Amino acid sequence: MRRVVITGMGAITPVGLSVEEFWNSVKEGKTNFAEVTRFDSTNYRAHMAAEINNFNPKDYMDFKSAKRMELFSQYAVAAAKEAIEQSGLDMTKEDPFRVGCSVGSGIGSMQVVEKSCEILNTKGPGRLNPLMIPLLISNMASGNVSIQFGLRGKNINVVTACATGTHSIGEAYRTIQCSDADVMVAGGTEAAITPTGFGGFAALTALTSSTDPERCSIPFDKERSGFVMGEGAGVVVLEELEHAKARGAKILGEGVGYGATGDAYHITSPAEDGSGAAKAMEWAVKEAGISTDDVWYVNAHGTSTHHNDLFETIAIKKTFGEHAKEMKINSTKSITGHLLGAAGAVEVITCVKELQEGLIHQTVGYKVPDEQCDLDYVGNGNVKMDIKYALTNSLGFGGHNASLLIKKYED
């Protein structure tokens, strides 16, 4: 199999509109949790969100293009722009059919659905926007990124709910390994903080009942009550190693393992025995040709819901055995909230930065240990630790499990 490296990264998040801003916030433990501002949440079961502030699509694309995209697509294009620019990829020197795109969204545009339903009910079907469908469908994240940057290779959209970003990068990784592309622009995006999107998750009792910004997103903490809904995008440029070397690209990290499984258990809850997530982790580690004892850090899915954090802990212990007690486990969602389809991609970026700097970020807000979640969740500040591998997990509604193993790059 061909080696696959990361040569560019881009992020649009509630705590920073670039990888640098985002990473600085992560290191500082800076969050952006507050009551929803985009609509009145008085009658909702939940009130806290991690909204993106000060995003201007015209900073990343022309006005005409922005007008023909919904917010989730705009986030994707913005993150892709940063990633491609960092990679130094020059499409005038590439075979465009060897450069592909795999940027997914778990939901697409709830905004268009809400507006269209209102128009349909008040003005009739004749007044619906002719672009309604291409605006709302989730594959337009990948479609718009490919159009904006001239990517004519394999162009796919993975939709696996909260595992979308991780699966998107994993499938892009496989695509390059199998010689179906030399470069893939991959990641996830989401912008679903709307009355219906927020209300749906609240009705499911998935969102936190807390209104305390310091205690609303607290993965693995005994007092956790649900996740904080966030939004944003994460995109990476994946590249075949020799292709990257030939053009003098700076290599940020290397993908060395990908595991993907299904629970076949429940539409929202992970399997209680953790077997599906455990097998995904096991396969990712096995592909790299290393022992589970060689992995000392897991960036967990860690949503701050009771079921996820408990069953993911069980899965980690099932995979790593006694070694799990010695490992560091954290959750980036303690800082960003849950970015849904974008979460896994942003967490891959987090892993790359941690490997580069030898720093594992704290799980912000973690205070009260849960006797059932009994691992080291990095609750007392960042940890300086020179690690070689970072394993990141994503678990999506429907029983979708994905794990990626990222390695500190060595020639």
List where the protein language model places each region:
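ACP-dependent fatty acid/polyketide chain-elongation machinery
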Residues: M1-S65, E242-E254, I349-T363, K407-D411
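Conserved beta-ketoacyl condensing-enzyme motif
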Residues: I6, K27-T160, T189-F198, T292-N308
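Conserved small-residue
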Residues: G8, V26, A80, C101, ...
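Glycine-/small-residue-rich "gating" segment that lines the acyl/pantetheine channel
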Residues: T122-N129, H167-G170, R174, E190-A246, ...
